[in-house]
Amino acid sequence: QRSLVGSEMCIRDRSYVIDVYRNPEMVQKNLFNLMLYVSFFPQLIAGPIIRYNEIAKQINNRTSSIEKTTEGISRFIRGLTKKLIIANATGYMADSIFALKITDYNFLVAWVGAIAYTLQIYYDFSGYSDMAIGMAKIFGFEFNENFNHPYSAKGIKDFWRRWHISLSLWFREYVYIPLGGNRKGKFRCEFNKMIVFLLTGIWHGANWTFVIWGLIHGCLLYTSPSPRDYAASR
């Protein structure tokens, strides 16, 4: 089982190192500002994964107001409600069902467990992101959104544009594009996507379950039509 905090910090800090390697002029010479970025607690637990160039200008040019503070508190409370009330309740339900003996399962119980777990992971993860965005706003920072109603997606491609957006953008910028993106033909493009989802699975957990999970999502991404295909068929 991975450490969520450690994995978030690892790829976030690595993005800074890679960006500085690509462009040495963006190095932060002020140690306090760099440590503020590295240790800024709202984003430590579960994102959003903030790249340094997204927050650098805000460090010395933050603006605070009663309106922003109120919005931040409201957003934090919304995230806390998601986590404590919805995620914990559905998580308890899912754990109780998954703890049953196989002989105690039936079609309905299995589906209730699957749906409960599906709701738990969304409200848990998005709740933490809401709390992070809210706390950041209280301190005068603006974080990008991390979830955009992923369960209303029209397909797996649309889903990954809505789910943990900052993670998808990170892998796009630091893995997919450096591998060649879509510039070297369709086969290479799909191969690069498969590598991205393999690494995404490993990021979620260093065991074969998540490796297989990543490969399945990579295969689904390859075989699924895009939202534009849905629109064209209407």
Labelled PLM ranges:
Residues 2:
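Cationic, low-complexity basic patches in intrinsically disordered or flexible, solvent-exposed regions
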Residues 6-224, 228, 234:
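Membrane-embedded transmembrane alpha-helical bundles that form the catalytic cores
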